[in-house]
Amino acid sequence: MIRSPSFRRYIVRWMFAMLVTCPLLSGLCLARVSADEPELTSLIGEDVGLCVEIRDLRSHLRDVPSTEWFRRLREMPLVKRWQQGPEFAKWQAGQATLTLLIGQPLDQFVSELFGESVVLAVSPSKSGPPGIVLLSRAAKDDSWDRVLALWDQLEAHEVQTKSAFGRSFQRRQKKTNGETSGPDLFTVKLGRILAISEREELILDVLARSASAPNEGRAKSLDQSPAYRHAIAALPEQCAVRVFADPRRWEEELRKDPASAERLLPLWHKLEWFSAGVELRDGIVGHAAVHHETSGLSAPWQRFVEASATPSDLATRLPADAVLAGEARIAPELLNWLRTLDESEKAKTDWQTFGKVTRGLLGRDLFDDVLPHARPSLGGVVVPKRPVEEQSAPVDGLLVWQFDLSHGPTRTDGQPELRESLDGGLLTLLNFAAVAHNSRNPVAPATLRVEHRDTLTIKWLDSLPPYRPAFGLGSEHLLLATDPRLISAFHDRKAADPALKSEPLFAAVHSRHIAEHSHWLFLNSRAAREFLTEQHEPLSRQVAHWRKLAPPSVSAQLDRVREFLTPFDAAFLAARITPGEVRFTAGAVTPDLRK
């Protein structure tokens, strides 16, 4: 898509230097956009297919070096080894050379060029590759003059000055052994703004939009586009990097590949805009939003959207010591719809076989008679064991699915009630597991256990290492677990008992990042680190036994996992689905729990 290796090289170098060195900046005071200086997005047309915008990056990164997660990152053995290696030495030598050339520290120079505002715009073309223009607003009026002079010093160019709309711009072509080579590069300096592109028409468009007189008949600028405004408004204001994409502009590109076009275009036509952003708050947080048409949507998707909007209190009943927890809002119709995605004969045969097996287990059809009783909430947790026992797994898991299992009127058609169907099917699976285990281990047979607690019935197998598989049926939930204690704890948990919702780290992440998202996944990496530290020796022995490895090598692997989890205390992934829009957020953070 980008034709010139030279242009690619300069963009990569500039972006890399900006992202790597800006966290090291100190208090350089940047100039602000004055009233007569245009926004960069006002200098490009609304026909762009992709726009990457970085605003006031220096302010966003100002506090990063003093944050806890960045301090931990610098203290990681991996980072220290890199700092002691040859690549870092080369980087330092190159930085020192550039510092001598530009006459000031490189980090200050990069901040001067890119710390305020940068825009990279890509415009699809009906013939040929897309056109690209890069714009950046520097802190000082002479910044770009020094950059262009340095560029000419490092690489010989033939420079031709041209003019349009009362302003001059340059056509630059690389010279090698006295001969010009490579594609043209066009640059124009507008005060503190520099625009660079391989396409002369894109530079002319920038010049035309910067002219003081209105341009009759010219297409709207990007900042006037309703789609762009709505897409950017869907992102948090704190985003340092923002991306906008217009699906309509890329349809011709998709059609160039007939195979992809046939699969993607029906869905692509429904997309109206896409936006994404990166936020540096508590850590690194990414956001994305997709807006789509609401007409002609399938009924299962509409039910899924409705299910996503229903409230849930599941986090108030999940254990506080979970290292991994999540919840999804699922409409039963969506599960049924999945069967129709693959229309091949093999897929149809497989589904028919699956239906016969489940009907034999449950005494009723899974999709027609069981799933319609499911409620939207489906969640689960992974909880570490303390202490780790030699013959049991180091973690336990619990899966919770909300079901309407209240007793209905007595059936007269001979078909079992839903609760009886689920109980019979799950009990059969437990019995199969017990028979398989006992046939190989007659000395320590697995034994079925049953416990009744009010409206809850729990059944599990003892002596089936490394777990004690269990299921529970209550009036509102179907529960599956690796240990019956998790089912009992879920059933018995009261409002005053410790729960995930009130765990300080989860509460901070939830309130700051995912409160409006009904689908979420949460990793308590701080608890995982503590578990790996406390149970390091028994974990090493256990994993070494299972994987038939030497304990020292397993110990080193666990140390690397713990190191990987060091910078951030939590990670999360969440989605919010509303009519016409889907939003995602994901991040790794170390929140200050004192705030």
Located regions from the model:
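A conserved glycine-rich beta-strand in the N-terminal activation segment of trypsin-fold
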Residues: 179-254, 464-549, 554
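Bacterial N-terminal signal peptides
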Residues: 14-27
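C-terminal regions of mature proteins
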Residues: 563-594
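Ordered core of a single globular domain
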Residues: 397-404, 477
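N-terminal secretory signal peptides that target proteins for export/translocation
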Residues: 1-12
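Solvent-exposed coil/turn segments that connect beta secondary-structure elements
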Residues: 55-57, 137-141, 191-193, 199-201, ...
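Structural boundary/hinge residues at secondary-structure and domain interfaces
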Residues: 33-131, 135-180, 223-275, 285, ...
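Flexible, glycine/threonine-enriched loop-and-boundary segments that flank and lead into catalytic domains
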Residues: 450-469
